[in-house]
């Protein structure tokens, strides 16, 4: 597999140079030019490797290998916004220090290309799959899955498969995902402007406000940047499913104004201090997490968009009952049911075997708070690329994937595909 490493690394680096975060739609480009160009690049590479490819209206593409009952590998090429705090060009695709740097390196352009070149390795060694491997690459995973909805309208989604967009050894369960917008009225607001966050599923790393009366000493003591009459708090971005890995810039900004308004204290109590016990909900898949990722002051109220990941065995009503106890208006922006697969099923067992073959580790399947395309399948799981002990880089500044991990993914994915489609 080593002879494909150089090509894989180069392709990942090239792909990172496309800013494929969601942007304004253009003609025949539903998620913007960057996403469409990135999809074209991926499919062009696949075609050059000798595979049949399809581009479904720049929503989603697929690469075909083999004949028979379809088996899915579901990856995505879109990314979250770069955010702040980078020490390298987030869209440079720089290869240095044994790593490929840039937004999407780990989530999910790197793994997508590893799956593609794993298929190429199997093809070149003469392996003929007894099933049709469909490598499906979407362009709207981070913002609503319109790509998958479109695919299901124009093509046939396989029943089973895996998504290289989670973690190892195998992810058998994913928490439910609920995005809500909470509306907090603020009487006599002590600010004229308050805004923070870039994405609903990314911990806010920058928040700005314009106080009616600027307390310079207090602002400096809290570590805020002062720009004319505006104050700026800085945090650290992270994936909203693991908010503890980041530092939310919204919280200190709210605390700055807390002593001036009971309404501000209420916001803190609801979304940061867990006064109503949302985070007490838990099961075998873990506890509920709540990440307030976006905030805006509009028409006399603070609107806060929260990303909630709730335990996989609990009903949605367990969460909405707690939200109702807050006594504030809220609206549901997005909901995805949890995923639970059989730990002892063939899919999980074969993937664990492939993982063990290249790591030497006998491991058990895990549950996560992240949401992957595996939910689009009747029998789907997430399989890599993250491993226990990895530095958190997904949705963080200075995202990267190591060349060592790229090589490992090439081997594991090739082995897994052979086991599941022979």
Each predicted region: which residue ranges?
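Midchain, well-structured core segments that form catalytic/ion-binding scaffolds
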Residues: 142, 148-313
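Conserved active-site and cofactor/substrate-binding residues in soluble primary-metabolism enzymes
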Residues: 3, 33, 37, 110-113, ...
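Acidic/His- and Gly-rich active-site-bordering loop/insert found
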Residues: 1-103, 124-129
């Amino acid at each position: 597999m080593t002879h494909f490493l150089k090509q894989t690394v180069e392709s990942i680096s090239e792909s990172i140079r496309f800013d494929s975060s969601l942007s304004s739609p253009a003609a025949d480009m539903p998620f913007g030019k960057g996403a469409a160009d990135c999809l074209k690049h991926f499919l062009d590479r696949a075609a050059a490797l000798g595979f049949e490819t399809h581009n479904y209206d720049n929503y989603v593409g697929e690469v075909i290998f083999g004949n028979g009952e379809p088996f899915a590998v579901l990856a995505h090429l879109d990314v979250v916004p770069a955010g702040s705090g980078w020490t390298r060009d987030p869209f440079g695709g720089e290869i240095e220090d044994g790593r490929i740097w840039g937004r999407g390196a780990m989530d999910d352009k790197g793994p997508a290309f590893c799956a593609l070149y794993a298929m190429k390795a199997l093809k070149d060694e003469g392996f003929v799959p007894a099933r049709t491997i469909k490598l499906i690459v979407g362009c709207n995973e981070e913002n609503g899955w319109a790509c998958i909805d479109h695919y299901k309208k124009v093509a046939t989604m396989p029943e089973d498969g895996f998504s290289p967009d989670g973690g190892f050894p195998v992810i058998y369960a994913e928490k439910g995902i609920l995005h809500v917008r909470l509306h907090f009225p603020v009487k006599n607001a002590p600010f004229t402007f308050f805004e923070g966050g870039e994405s609903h599923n990314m911990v806010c790393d920058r928040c700005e406000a314009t106080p009616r009366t600027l307390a310079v000493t207090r602002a400096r003591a809290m570590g805020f940047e002062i720009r004319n009459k505006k104050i700026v708090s800085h945090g650290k971005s992270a994936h909203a499913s693991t908010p503890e890995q980041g530092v939310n810039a919204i919280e200190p900004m709210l605390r700055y104004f807390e002593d001036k308004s009971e309404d501000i204290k209420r916001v803190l109590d609801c979304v940061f201090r867990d006064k109503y016990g949302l985070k007490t909900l838990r099961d075998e898949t873990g506890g509920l997490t709540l990440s307030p990722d976006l905030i805006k002051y509009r028409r006399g109220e603070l609107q806060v968009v929260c990303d909630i990941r709730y335990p996989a065995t609990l009903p949605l009503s367990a969460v909405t009952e707690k939200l109702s106890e807050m006594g504030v208006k809220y609206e549901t922006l997005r909901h995805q049911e949890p995923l639970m697969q059989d730990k002892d099923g063939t899919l999980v067992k074969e993937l664990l075997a492939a993982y063990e073959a290249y790591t030497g580790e006998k491991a058990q399947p895990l549950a996560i708070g992240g949401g992957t395309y595996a939910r689009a399948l009747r029998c789907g799981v997430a399989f890599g690329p993250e491993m226990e002990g990895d530095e958190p880089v997904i949705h963080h500044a200075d995202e990267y994937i190591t060349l060592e991990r790229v090589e490992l993914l090439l081997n594991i994915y090739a082995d897994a595909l052979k086991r599941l489609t022979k």
